[in-house]
């Protein structure tokens, strides 16, 4: 029965951040195919990963568990291996690959976004990603952190649950999002955003 903490000072955040990274090294989801270099090699901090595979994975993981999304991602990448292939596909072909994954507007938005992205460099900012259909702050932050090693916080349901427990906060209501974003940012290790 601890008191909830409203603000995370640097002194309070550093040991929590370290503990989270230690936990991640032991129990985290390493080895996800979109977070590896070709050949299955983990990236060095200066390595850029393929933004396309990460983007597809992050959209599939919106409201969908990893165990469900992973086989869909593998099939998707076999059929649409590049943003150009996705943009050139018919919407019916895209929907067919998405069939069974649910939340079908995600497939339509991926297709729309692919058509906007073709011929342009990948976005390197939150604003650039969030300008695309179906991309919010958490998805944009996750893509930028994973693909480009940019230190940006995320705040999905899992992160909220962990933060609520760490900070002795009652079940997180939506109106506390600003507080939870501040905690997520305070706990982010700028040297290890992936």
Task: Outline where the language-model segments fall.
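Catalytic cores of DNA base-excision repair glycosylases
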Residues: 2, 22-194
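N-terminal, positively charged, Ser/Thr/Ala/Gly-biased leader segments
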Residues: 13-19
């Amino acid at each position: 029965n601890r008191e909830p903490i409203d603000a995370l000072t640097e002194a309070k955040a550093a040991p929590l951040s370290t503990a989270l990274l230690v936990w991640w090294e032991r129990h985290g989801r390493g080895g996800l195919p979109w977070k590896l270099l070709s050949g299955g090699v983990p990236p060095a901090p200066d390595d850029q990963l393929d933004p396309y595979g990460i983007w597809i994975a992050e959209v599939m993981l919106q409201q969908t568990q990893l165990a469900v999304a992973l086989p869909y991602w593998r099939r998707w990448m076999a059929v649409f291996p590049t943003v150009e292939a996705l943009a050139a596909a018919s919407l019916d072909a895209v929907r067919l690959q998405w069939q069974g994954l649910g939340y079908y507007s995600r497939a339509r938005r991926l297709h729309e976004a692919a058509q906007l992205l073709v011929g342009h460099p990948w976005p390197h900012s939150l604003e650039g990603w969030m300008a695309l259909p179906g991309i919010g702050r958490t998805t944009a932050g996750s893509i930028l952190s994973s693909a480009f090693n940019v230190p940006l916080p995320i705040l999905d349901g899992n992160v909220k649950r962990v933060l609520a427990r760490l900070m002795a906060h009652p079940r997180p209501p939506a109106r506390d999002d600003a507080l939870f974003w501040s905690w997520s940012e305070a706990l982010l290790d700028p040297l290890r955003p992936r």
